From Swiss-Prot:
Its cofactor is Mg(2+). The gene is pnp. It comes from Citrifermentans bemidjiense (strain ATCC BAA-1014 / DSM 16622 / JCM 12645 / Bem). The keyword Cytoplasm applies. It comes from the Bacteria. Disulfide bonds: none annotated. This is Polyribonucleotide nucleotidyltransferase. Residues 619-687 form the S1 motif domain. Mg(2+) binds at D483, D489. It holds the Pfam family RNase_PH.
Amino acid sequence: MVHTVQAECCGKTITIETGKIAKQASGAVMIKSGDTMVLVTAVAMKSAKEGQGFFPLTVNYQEKAYAGGRIPGSFFKREGRPSDNETLTCRLIDRPIRPLFPENFLNDTQIMATVVSADKDNDPGILSMIGASAALMVSDVPFAGPIAGVKVGRVDGQFIANPTAEQEEKSDLEIVIAASQDAILMVEGSACEVSEDDLLEAIFFGHKAVQPVLAAQLELAKKVGTSKREIPAPVVNEALKARVSALAKEGMKQAVRIKTKVERHLAIDAIADETVAALSAEFEGSEKEIKGFIEDLEYDLVREHIIKDGQRIDGRDTKTIRAISTEVSLLPRAHGSALFTRGETQSIVAATLGTSVDEQRIDSLYGDSRKKFMLHYNFPPYSVGETSFRLAPGRREIGHGMLAERALQQVLPKHDDFPYTIRIVSDITESNGSSSMATVCGGSLSMMDAGIPIKAPVAGIAMGLIKEGDDFAILSDILGDEDHLGDMDFKVAGTAEGVTALQMDIKIGGVTREIMSAALAQAKAGRIHILGEMAKTIGASRGDLSAFAPRITTIWVKVDKIRDVIGSGGKNIRSVTEATGVSIDIDDTGKINIASTNKEACDLAIKMIRNLTAEAEEGKLYMGTVKKIMEFGAFVEIFPGTDGLVHVSELDTERVKNVSDILKEGDKVLVKCIGIDKQGKIKLSRKEALGLTFTE
């Protein structure tokens, strides 16, 4: 049976339908707003695999090319590996729903969101977030939903829910929020140095906006009436748990206070091994359970120590930032480079400048576009003392890179003022928490080292949360273990003036306004401290580019002269690049960017282009080349492709019988422009140029 519900979200109608398509899935909905439609399915296997120790949730998001009336541009003409945008949308769907499954539900579960129709004004990613929740709500899969997503923008001081493409262009912030009826579950976005108070208002504006969508999902679930699966409660061996606690608790109290990560992990592993050995005879085959109870002990002890004593794993209080060291110009041949170290987290970051040919081509639902700023984040296994087989970057690397890219993009100069393609690469060389924020700091330093005139330095910090009942502690600059054992990972990046990017994920049922406000305020204090540490090394962009970076000079020509620059079949522009070795980019407005690491080559290219587009001026002297001898005079080329006639009467002060007595083809001759007729024909005189000196 087909069931349909509708919700109004700030003037836009969202329709959710189930029971018509993909009926063999555990749950399936078609969600629509405007002309954008997404099919979202949820399937969970009937039982968990034997020995399954984690929740295997997979989220897939795919944009079908036909949804935008396009044929894929790849060689095979079909959809292939996910684009970065599809990968990022998968993460947006996954992160708010993952904490809402029961802890003991370990069945293979897959969410698939397929964009089947798309307009430019209704974001399919937002609809996919809502659709994933709705598909789970109408299924028999246990899920503590609903949740809903919304994108918030601000134009002329007014907040807008799910802005159109035109409104997004004018907006000074873009934040995606996922929320339940009572709390915020996830936040991600960027802003143009917006204050913490304004961000908080935007987030809770979004929370209010999604309430009708949440109500519609509850209505749909009620209409469908599917009963949820019964999940057996986990059986806990209380006797074993008590024995593990008795044997290991005192040792664990000391181990969790060891300040260095490797030594701490070795100590905890040693306690686990000793406990397994001590209990192996009494509780045969219980090694996995024993190690699970050791992990529970670590979880409880770390959190208790923070809540009761205000002291963290490495001895810091809740607000202290780890020691920071910075270095720039680390790599002599890179255009800009930095080494950023914060505690046991370290990143080498390099900035490279390129031209328009280096722009990334993006093939999307809405057509081709070009990307002029890229940040790539790499997390090699050695950074955490591990080994693995590395192929393409994973979802986490793409997500962390995009967060850092958004943070830095807000301070870039306008492309007209700095017409370079910029690529930042961050290689994490050590990691113990907050490597994406180390990338932001290192990226800012490397751009300043490269001489990119950024608006202001940017720093980032990761905040954590430990919440027990009504008590909570907010942690600045979290360690990896604090991320793992805590309830929130809240990354905030920005300048001294305001926030440029943020991302919040939680592992509990939601966070309140009070917690978010306190976290943002504490993050600001931490960010200002980090900016101060960075400024000790470099506080503003260098005044010049690296000697190894291309110099781009911009000149303009009249639009009707573009064809003269290019020439037939590209002949003219090719002759310039071959003669000078420069890279030239021409757009249809007459703007020409000339790039070269050699100033002399660039100057020569400019001169050659000026010659190609130059127009004769009456009364001006020109050094020309005789192209053709006629009985009535000689044709002299004064610019490439532009010549004029020197009539026989204008060859000399005395009467000339034969033109060839004075000039021959190929001769260089100084002439003066004495007129241009209505047809644009140029009249030249050698006679009037005699005795004059030519200067370019």
